[in-house]
Structures are given as structure tokens and as C-alpha cells.
Amino acid sequence: MGAFLDKPKMEKHNAQGQGNGLRYGLSSMQGWRVEMEDAHTAVIGLPSGLETWSFFAVYDGHAGSQVAKYCCEHLLDHITNNQDFKGSAGAPSVENVKNGIRTGFLEIDEHMRVMSEKKHGADRSGSTAVGVLISPQHTYFINCGDSRGLLCRNRKVYFFTQDHKPSNPLEKERIQNAGGSVMIQRVNGSLAVSRALGDFDYKCVHGKGPTEQLVSPEPEVHDIERSEEDDQFIILACDGIWDVMGNEELCDFVRSRLEVTDDLEKVCNEVVDTCLYKGSRDNMSVILICFPNAPKVSPEAVKKEEELDKYLESRVEEIIKKQGEGVPDLVHVMRTLASENIPSLPPGGELASKRNVIEAVYNRLNPYKNDDTDSTSTDDMW
């Protein structure tokens, strides 16, 4: 569940890179949570003859960050170094890759269990994992838990991973077969995901294999043939993002941002901020991977964006002036704007994605405001 801070930590960790015809950016932010338990991996060019392959993943830790941190450093090695992945001589086949990914997950989970037992079970943390392994011909989506990945192809959501929730019929059946129950949509009324790495308290049912436990470390793997013409971008994100934005919303929002900037870190920062302002209370991490045919910056879109920002600035000034005596608080300004039909707001992001612009104008016009009223708080914002 996790405890919350009095105000969100909005400092971000960023990275970006390019290679193998891909560009990526990432952003992660602690937000309202007391701890930062997310982790991520981004590797372009893999060792051992896989220089044209790339790997990206987001890990959403719970009950501590140890498992997420260990996976972000070691999961890729466990996947690419097992015999199932390597197969016989030459490049691994599609089946080799899929089997190798599954084996890698089971191996790292068992390895972490042994380490945990040596420490007398001191680590009770767990982590989801969502990732993509991109070869020259295929994109392999990998999912274990309720983080999510999606592929935008030809301006639409073409594929997205399915969240592993305890209430899903197949997941529920496995949990019940292992002697557990699903209460308040949680495993034994406690854990909100039905598949994860770590969480060894839920993996000790005697007579059941590793994939038959209350919580399973088995990933779902989907291979998608790459389309140079139509593939645009991939988004990997933890549930702190998906809790407040749907697949189509996020796809539309990212596409609209790519038309106004080619800075992928900036796009990811906008996603994270927008989700905070839409009410997400969780840690947030997002990786954006762009294929060669991703949307390009359009002068028309840039002009439209500048006009929107100017319009919002003038409206904030008008709202403050209209108040007469005393300056209205930021919540009042946001609510007033939310009640209006403002043209050309970014799709998917809507007014929340312009909160930084609105706040900057508000602060400029009201430099002596009391800091207590400065709410990055999203409580009761609208």
C-alpha cells in the first residue's frame, strides 16, 4: 500500500540515448510516495553477438526496492545467458527467445529466493516487470504484473500487454488452486498483483511448482513482427501512469508531444507531470522508445501550441484581475479554466498537461503568495 508525503517529490531522473535505428528517453519521479521503489533498464546493443538488439524495461517495486533494483541490473543477463535463449548455433529463433525470456525470469526469481533465504528471509519486497526486447525483425513484449507496455503503429494503439490482476479468471484459478483466495481484488486480501518477481511469502506452497504458486514469476511474452513503415513508438510504464491515463489517451498525448518537440526526455517528463496532476499518488516511471517512423516535429503543431500557451496566459491574467481584491488561489484558477471549453488542448493530457504553464503565469503575477497555498497538491484541484 505505502505511505504518502505531505507534498510530492517532483525531482526527476532522466536519461536518453540512440542506436540500432531507435531513440529513447525516460523519466522517473517519486511523487507522493515516501519511498522510490521503481527501477528501469535501457540497453542499446546487447553483448554476445546481439549488437543489433536492444532491451528496455520498467520495474515497479513494492514492500521495498531491493527486488526491483536487482532485476534492473541482472534480469537481462539471466535472459540472454541461459541455454534456452541461445539454442543451437546462429541467431536465436523466435521460440528460443520466448523460451529464454521465460527461463530467465524463473532463474532470477529462484536466484533471489536463495539469496533471501541466506539472509533468513529478511527481504519481503517484490516487483513487476514490463519490457521489450527488440531485434532487427521482431519486438518481444514481456510482462509480469500490472505495469504495461504498448506499441503505437500507424497512429493507433496496435498492441498492449494485459495486466496480471488477482481477479482475472485464470489468475484467480491458480491462486485458489494454491490454497489462496482473492479478497478486495488482492491475493489473500493483501497483494494487488498476481504475478511478480520476489514476493517470496506468496511462493511457499508445498507440492506446487514456481508457476503454480499464489504469485507467479512467469512472464507473458508476445512476439510482433516489426513494420518499418508503420511502427512509431513503444511506451513502457508502471501503474502510476496507467492509473490515470488509458492506452489511447497516452498514445494520443505522446503523439501530440512528438509533434512539438524531438526531446524524448522532455516528452517523458510531460507524461509524468500530467499524471501527477491527474491525481496519480504512486511512483511514476515511463520509457518512450521511438522507431524511425515516429511522429516528427511539425511547424504547424508548434505554432498551435504557442498560441494555446499564450491564450492560457491571458486567461489566467483575466481570472486574477476579475477577482478584484485579493488574489484567487491556484485551485480556483484551475477550476475556472476546467469549466471552459478551451480549444486545442493536448489530446489525452487535456488541461492537466498545461498545469506547469498555468502555474508559471500565476506565480509571475502573484510573486508574494504564501507558500502554503502553492499546491502541487492535486487534492481537490478541479
Swiss-Prot record:
The modification Phosphoserine is found at S375, S377. GO terms for biological process: N-terminal protein myristoylation; negative regulation of canonical NF-kappaB signal transduction; negative regulation of non-canonical NF-kappaB signal transduction; positive regulation of canonical NF-kappaB signal transduction; positive regulation of canonical Wnt signaling pathway; protein dephosphorylation; regulation of canonical NF-kappaB signal transduction. One of its GO terms (molecular function) is magnesium ion binding. Keywords: Cytoplasm, Hydrolase, Lipoprotein, Magnesium, Manganese, Membrane, Metal-binding, Myristate, Nucleus, Phosphoprotein, Protein phosphatase. Mn(2+) 1 binds at D60, G61. Gene3D superfamilies: Phosphatase 2C, C-terminal domain suprefamily, PPM-type phosphatase domain. The keyword Ubl conjugation does not apply. Belongs to the PP2C family. This is Protein phosphatase 1A. It comes from Bos taurus.
